[in-house]
Curated annotation (Swiss-Prot):
Belongs to the glycosyltransferase GT106 family. Pathway: Glycan metabolism. Glycans are attached at residues 7, 110, 276-277, 435. Signal peptide: none annotated. It is an enzyme of class 2 (transferase). Its EC number is 2.4.1.-. It comes from the Eukaryota. Keywords: Carbohydrate metabolism, Fucose metabolism, Glycoprotein, Glycosyltransferase, Transferase. The keyword Protease does not apply. The keyword Transcription regulation does not apply. This is O-fucosyltransferase 10. Substrate binds at residues 203-205. GO terms for molecular function: glycosyltransferase activity. It comes from Arabidopsis thaliana.
Length: 460
């Protein structure tokens, strides 16, 4: 059973009384601007809550920056339930929707006139206390932008506690998102009757922009190379044409840096033992050249579904053009899957793996392929299927070990983020007050728990 949060963590460091939810007088208002996609913004929000607690500041509901890549103009309230966010953090960090008029009048109601601080990446607690706090006390309000990765992973336990509460209790998806997500989960369970309602989710990063960014080639010859060059220039300007930038698609592939194709994912899963009765939810944006690349995966796994195939056009219409809202649907359906398969790095799989570890006490089945090894195996045209299956079984065993691993003694760093490895630091929040009786953005779990076996003898 998880240990309760120490009394000193709550009372001494936050100066609060949970009976009255009273906090000590604040040192000012904190405004942050979160950039990136859904989970980079999620990271920024959790870090903002932690920084506000550290500085004893009032946090203004974070603003979301519009990015040319993500093309999503959503505000905080479009993605998350603002009321739930505010009430869940009551007594820990005060949250407001706007800076009060008496302060904004000093800056002619112009947010850009508020003192702006450019905080270094992975800033320490000492940095915030020495460099940021004095400015906040002097002006009563500060703005930090950008705010991606602006707080070190290694912080005192009472700051980690705030990250845990923000991530797993306070951030609940908005009603439109959670309502449709619940329908999608129900439909996946219904379509997975052959496996007792259990399904596999695959996060497939084979969208056009991801293929372009990876600088990898996929048998498309000169036409594909020219197409990718145009996309890179349009989206990232001259980033890939700098003199010090050497593009080596062959080395990228051997080093496991290329996104796996749908065919490669299918071969891997069949080799691991997932048969053609397995229901698969594909969490992805629009696949690059879908007619060409999705067909092999569909043939190997006829029970292949996406949010587009599970929802009606009318249900998806309010989400079209909003990549973060679409990603939130994928996140929730993947969160409740029996097995989660990640095929590329990024914030989505790291946050999702952490969330599943938190929900299921560290025991969440995950497939994390050894991509350099997988590439070598797939390139061996003389390898027999039985040999390939044996190698995939070994890879699956290693993935399962990593998936259920709960590091007890470890040094927290960027690679062992609390968002990916939330235990044991976040374990105690199960014992906080009744304010936290539900799990925020989690739907009713019902019988969905990563325990039963979906793997059988695969036959191609």
């Amino acid at each position: 059973m998880p240990k309760p949060c120490p009394n000193s963590t709550v009372s001494s460091h936050f100066g609060l009384n949970r009976e009255s939810s009273a906090l000590a007088p604040s040192s000012g208002y904190l405004i942050v601007e979160a950039n990136g996609g859904l989970n980079q913004q999620r990271s920024a929000i959790c870090n903002a809550v932690a920084v506000a607690g550290l500085l004893n500041a009032v946090l203004v509901i974070p603003r979301f920056e519009f990015h040319a890549i993500w093309k999503d103009s959503s505000n905080f309230g479009d993605i998350y339930d603002e009321d739930h966010f505010i009430s869940s953090l009551e007594g820990y960090v005060k949250i407001v929707r706007d800076v009060p008029d008496e302060i904004m009048t000093r800056f002619s109601y112009n947010v850009s006139s508020i003192p702006t601080i450019r905080v270094q990446a992975w800033a320490t607690v000492n940095y915030y206390n020495g460099e940021v706090y004095p400015v906040l006390k002097e002006h009563g309000v500060i703005r930090i932008t950008p705010f991606a990765n602006r707080l070190a992973m290694s912080v005192p336990p009472y700051i980690q506690l705030l990250r845990c509460i923000a991530n797993y209790k306070a951030l609940k998806f908005s009603s439109p998102i959670s309502t449709l997500a619940e329908k999608l989960v129900d439909r996946m369970v219904e379509k997975s009757s052959a496996t007792g309602g259990k399904y596999v989710s695959v996060h497939l990063r084979f969208e056009e922009d991801m293929v372009a960014f990876s600088c990898c080639l996929y048998e498309g010859g000169r036409a594909e190379k020219s197409e990718m060059d145009v996309i890179r220039q349009k989206s990232w300007k001259g980033k890939f044409k700098r003199r010090d930038r050497v593009i080596r698609p062959d080395l990228n592939r051997v080093n496991g840096k290329c996104p796996l194709t749908p065919l490669e994912v299918g071969m891997m899963l069949r080799g691991m033992g997932f048969d053609n009765n397995t229901s698969i939810y594909l969490a992805s944006g629009r696949i690059y050249q879908p007619e060409k690349h999705l067909a092999p995966l569909q043939e190997m796994f006829p029970r292949l579904y996406t949010k587009e195939s599970l929802a009606t056009p009318e249900e998806l219409a309010p989400f079209q053009g909003y990549s973060s809202r679409m990603a939130a649907l994928d996140y929730t359906v993947s969160l409740l899957s029996e097995v989660f398969v990640t095929t590329q790095g990024g914030n989505f799989p790291h946050f999702l793996m952490g969330h599943r570890r938190f929900l299921f006490g560290g025991h969440a089945k995950t497939v994390i392929p050894d991509k350099p090894k997988l590439v070598l195996l797939l390139q061996d045209m003389e390898m027999r299927w039985e040999v390939f299956k044996k190698e995939m079984k070994l890879m699956l065993g290693e993935s399962d070990r990593k998936g259920v691993m709960v590091p007890r003694v470890r040094k927290i760093n960027r690679k062992t983020s609390i968002y990916t490895y939330p235990l044991p630091e976040c374990e105690c929040i199960f014992h906080l007050s009744s304010n936290f009786s539900n799990t925020g953005n989690i739907l009713s779990l019902g019988a969905l728990h990563p325990s039963s076996n979906l793997i059988s003898s695969a036959r191609l």
